[in-house]
Design a protein with these regions (language model features):
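Conserved N-terminal segment of class I S-adenosyl-L-methionine
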Residues: 1-84, 94-96, 111, 227-231, ...
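Helix-to-beta-strand junctions that scaffold the AdoMet/dcAdoMet cofactor pocket
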Residues: 33, 104-105, 118-120
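Short glycine-centered segments of the SAM/dcSAM-binding site in methyltransferase folds
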Residues: 37, 121-123
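Short, solvent-exposed loop/turn segments at secondary-structure junctions
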Residues: 44-47, 65-67, 101, 131-133, ...
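Acidic/polar helix N-cap motif
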Residues: 81-84, 88-89, 106
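A short SAM/SAH-binding and catalytic strip from SAM-dependent methyltransferases
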Residues: 94-106
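S-adenosyl-L-methionine-dependent methyltransferase catalytic module, highlighting the catalytic core
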Residues: 108-113, 123-236
Length: 240
């Protein structure tokens, strides 16, 4: 066990701290009925989100990265150009995107496509970073070359980890997400803000303690929830 991992185990034990992934998967389970037809947008290669969704229903994955074809949890994998999805109207009971919206260059097109492929009464569940957070601000301000250099290193990921994709952050505030849902004809979204463990503090104990202080502050009061990094959202397509 490394010193850095020891810090996470000491201050963020799994028995007392859920992080951001557990609440997101719970959101999906609470809103997606068993045996649903699920579209995972930005599915990528095999991952925990796809595995979780496959335990709920039949999952079709779509991504601009051909590596989606290597995702063993998908019943179907589709590579597309990132604009219009190659599915008929009302094809799915649920759509899910996990840390995808920050990479979407044209968010209103994305939300309208989600609304189109959802059946009436269907749900869209997503997780994405909040723009008003030091991680998102850094990713937005730094050139992508620096993001490639630093992002995985700061999170303590190995060389085998996938390089981060380019980011746009054009939909990553609560107000913008609410507006996009309305413009696409979706219901008023239910949004939750979370600040999980400081994963970008794995590179050095000094970073860890600094980011932990930030986590303790923004989780101390609802007043600071707009400064938390993780946005969880669920919205439905109105039933006919």
């Amino acid at each position: 066990m490394t010193i850095k991992q020891d810090l996470f185990d000491r201050y963020y034990p799994k028995s007392h701290f859920e992080g951001g992934t557990v609440p997101f998967f719970r959101l999906c389970r609470e809103n997606i009925s068993p045996q649903s037809r699920i579209l995972e947008i930005g599915a990528g290669p095999s991952n925990e989100c796809s595995r979780t969704l496959s335990g709920i229903g039949q999952v079709t994955g779509i991504d601009i990265d051909p590596d989606v074809r290597n995702n063993v949890f998908l019943s179907e994998a589709v590579v597309f150009e990132g604009r219009k999805m190659p599915f008929e109207d009302a094809s799915f009971d649920a759509c899910v995107s996990n840390f995808v919206l920050e990479h979407v260059e044209h968010p209103i097109e994305h939300f309208r496509e989600v609304a189109r492929v959802l059946r009436p009464g269907g749900v869209y569940c997503l997780r994405t970073p909040n723009l008003y957070h030091y991680v998102s601000m850094g990713a937005r301000l730094l050139p992508h070359s620096m993001h490639l250099l630093l992002a995985n290193r700061l999170r303590g990921l190995g060389e085998e980890a996938h390089d981060p994709y380019p980011t746009w952050f054009r939909s990553n505030t609560r107000s913008k997400l609410t507006t996009l849902c309305r413009m696409a004809g979706l219901d008023e979204p239910r949004i939750t803000m979370l600040e999980p463990e400081p994963s970008y503090g794995r590179a050095h104990p000094i970073l860890f303690y600094g980011f932990m202080a930030y986590e303790r502050l923004v989780n101390s009061s609802k007043i600071f929830e707009g400064m938390r990094i993780t946005v969880l959202l669920a919205t439905h397509k109105p039933a006919v």
